[in-house]
Every structure is written in C-alpha cells, then in structure tokens.
Amino acid sequence: MRIEQINARALEKVNYDRYLLSQAIAKRVNELINGAKPLIELPKPNMQLTEIATLEIAEGLVKVKEV
C-alpha cells in the first residue's frame, strides 16, 4: 500500500484532524524509540518509525484519544 493511502486511512481514524494525527504519531514514535515493539508485521525492512506509527493507526491497532 502506498504511503498516501496509509495517510488517508489514518486521517479517517481521527476524523480528518491532522493535528490530532500528528500528535498521535509523535506519541507512538516516542514509544517505539523507548523500546515498544511494533504492533504490525513490517511489510518492508528498514521502515521509518513514522511510517510504522502511521500504519498502526491506519490499521486501527493504536487507539487515538483527543488531546
């Protein structure tokens, strides 16, 4: 799946609130940096942490709460 499609699906999960999505991605990236395991099987090696976080949100594996 292309990153544009993943971003569109992730935006759907947060009711098209780009600010909320960016906050959720940043929070998940910090969790990954601090040792959390990805919740998805990586479709390609060497994915960036932001791509992993966005894909997890798009798949509904990470719940996003309003800030």
Curated annotation (Swiss-Prot):
Its EC number is 2.7.7.6. GO terms for molecular function: DNA binding; DNA-directed RNA polymerase activity. One of its GO terms (cellular component) is DNA-directed RNA polymerase complex. GO terms for biological process: DNA-templated transcription. It catalyses: RNA(n) + a ribonucleoside 5'-triphosphate = RNA(n+1) + diphosphate. Transmembrane segments: none annotated. The keyword ATP-binding does not apply. The keyword Nucleotidyltransferase applies. Pfam families: RNA_pol_Rpb6 (PF01192). It comes from the Bacteria. Disulfide bonds: none annotated. Keywords: DNA-directed RNA polymerase, Nucleotidyltransferase, Transcription, Transferase. NCBIfam families: PRK00392.6-2. Promotes RNA polymerase assembly. Latches the N- and C-terminal regions of the beta' subunit thereby facilitating its interaction with the beta and alpha subunits. The RNAP catalytic core consists of 2 alpha, 1 beta, 1 beta' and 1 omega subunit. When a sigma factor is associated with the core the holoenzyme is formed, which can initiate transcription. Belongs to the RNA polymerase subunit omega family. This is DNA-directed RNA polymerase subunit omega. It comes from Nautilia profundicola (strain ATCC BAA-1463 / DSM 18972 / AmH).
